[in-house]
Amino acid sequence: PKTLEQAEIEKVDLAIAMTQYDEVNMVACQMIKHISKKTKTMARIRATQYLGGKGSEIFEAGDYTIDVVISPENLITDFIKRIIEVPGANKVLDFGNGQASMVSVKAKGGLITGHKISELKEIIPNVDVRVAAINRDENLIIPNGSDTINKGDEVFFISAKKDIKKVISTIYQYDKGYKNIMIAGGGRIGRRLANSLESKYRVKIIEADKERCVYLNEKLENSLILHGDSSDSELLEEENIDNMDLFCALTNNDEANVMSVSYTHLTLPTNGEV
């Protein structure tokens, strides 16, 4: 408390607790609220027991109020999941309580490619869509109806979430959605992603730590857990990487992620990598 008082916390509009320890972040926010109730608090929380169910109630009770809880792992998991659910998309941002989305997609083979934006109304007449921006050769364009979408453009559009796939199909031609997914790394992010996907997709996880494999096998119901090195090309071949629709490199080792993605890209240039 003395440190916070010396820092004149009562004059601060927003305080962010970002240490590596959840409990320290929580107590820091508690102390800040005790000294200055008007100061908004934001805390990084990683442990799953604090993020759902009764565990999350602590953030709503008394002096333990945290105005904004940030879970990096959840944010990354949600980001990847949104891309998986929208084949062809590079980025997906939901807003309006999940009713609308802004999506970026690379123009390739769709009906609107090579045509004016105004022609979208003729191709998908019952869909309300707005092309917000075009990234062309690293130059940002704020377009109007007379602008043309060229092959290779990164197109940012806004539409109702239910219409996203219809719009993407006019910009990017893809054969099918994802069905078979391989995840390299069964850490916090890998496990959460598998848990969110295994009810709809066939999921395989490659994890180097044997004890972690046992843990994953206990926590996940429909995912196949494999013990091994995800950067091992022989292992990837043995596990039929050529049958995977998407490969997600999510280990804690950046070099291993780069190596495994590079291998899958060279072997399977038409498949997806994250």
Segment roles from a protein language model:
Residues 1-274:
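Cytosolic regulatory regions of ion transport systems
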